[in-house]
Amino acid sequence: MKVLPPPSIPLLGAHTSTAGGLKNAIYEGRDIGASTVQIFTANQRQWQRRALKEEVIEDFKAALKETDLSYIMSHAGYLINPGAPDPVILEKSRIGIYQEILDCITLGISFVNFHPGAALKSSKEDCMNKIVSSFSQSAPLFDSSPPLVVLLETTAGQGTLIGSNFEELGYLVQNLKNQIPIGVCVDTCHIFAAGYDITSPQGWEDVLNEFDEYVGLSYLRAFHLNDSMFPLGANKDRHAPLGEGYIGKESFKFLMTDERTRKIPKYLETPGGPENWQKEIGELLKFSKNRDS
């Protein structure tokens, strides 16, 4: 099983809109100065998804070629719970995982990002084992080694969600790495909300060392860049524009300049829409360029 290699240059983007067609998210990315984007390939709040039409596939691939955007990420639907204790929801989730991965392969997308799941009334151990089983069922889709990596996103520690600590993510990665191409997407707001202090370079040093211990830095494949409206350890998933929350710009400067993180693709999910994303991308690129000068 071949695994998609990391990019050779820093890539920055945002979660852009597919209104009017999937291709439009790519063009919106170009218009805000992005080199990558995150999208929804289907309605994120419904179980059913439409079959991809050939015209949609061709237009999407043409947009990629025209804009030179790469390492596109799809964010899977919010209803999917790979560790659901309810057998009906679990089966729907497994079908949703399979369909999402299949569509991403068809479109030539590089990353597909999932929320790991919620234990609800079951134990976290049972939930994590179900999560492993759910993703394992999609292993045959990777027999031909498509350039796609499944990412599990860090969570903010609210409720019974899995993935708010690196030990849980490490368990999932270690149990899936020989079955599917697997990695982690670190959401800066989420890990801060979960108690990981990333407000300073030393804070990031400690966090990266802990991630390496439990998961392995080679499995850190993407970042969601968000500041936090709430303080450290609040377990609240509320995004703020970069530098306008409790995390601060120094944290994002570190990610753009440290050799371990600067080339890992980064996707903004901050409030403010395209105008703000264009400004934030410009500021992040300045951090990177100042490092090289």
Swiss-Prot record:
| GO biological process entries | base-excision repair
Q: Which residues bind Zn(2+) 1?
A: H75, H115, E153
Q: Which residues bind Zn(2+) 3?
A: H190, D237, H239
This protein's cofactor list reads: Zn(2+)
Keywords assigned: DNA damage, DNA repair, Endonuclease, Hydrolase, Metal-binding, Nuclease, Zinc
Which Enzyme Commission number(s) are listed? 3.1.21.2
The UniProt record gives the binding positions of Zn(2+) 2 as E153, D187, H224, E269
Family note = Belongs to the AP endonuclease 2 family.
Record function comment: Endonuclease IV plays a role in DNA repair. It cleaves phosphodiester bonds at apurinic or apyrimidinic (AP) sites, generating a 3'-hydroxyl group and a 5'-terminal sugar phosphate.
Q: How is the cofactor bound?
A: Binds 3 Zn(2+) ions.
TM spans, by residue? none
- Annotated PANTHER family: APURINIC-APYRIMIDINIC ENDONUCLEASE, ENDONUCLEASE IV ENDODEOXYRIBONUCLEASE IV
Is Kinase one of the keywords UniProt gives this record? no
Q: Which branch of life, at top level?
A: Bacteria
Q: Which NCBIfam families match?
A: nfo (TIGR00587), PRK01060.1-2 (NF002197)
Classification of source organism: Bacteria, Pseudomonadati, Chlamydiota, Chlamydiia, Chlamydiales
InterPro entries the record matches: AP_endonuc_2, AP_endonuc_F2_Zn_BS, Xyl_isomerase-like_sf, Xyl_isomerase-like_TIM-brl
Gene3D superfamilies in the cross-refs: Divalent-metal-dependent TIM barrel enzymes
**Gene that this polypeptide is encoded by:** nfo
Protein name (record): Probable endonuclease 4
Q: Which terms in the Gene Ontology molecular function aspect does this entry carry?
A: deoxyribonuclease IV (phage-T4-induced) activity; DNA binding; DNA-(apurinic or apyrimidinic site) endonuclease activity; phosphoric diester hydrolase activity; zinc ion binding
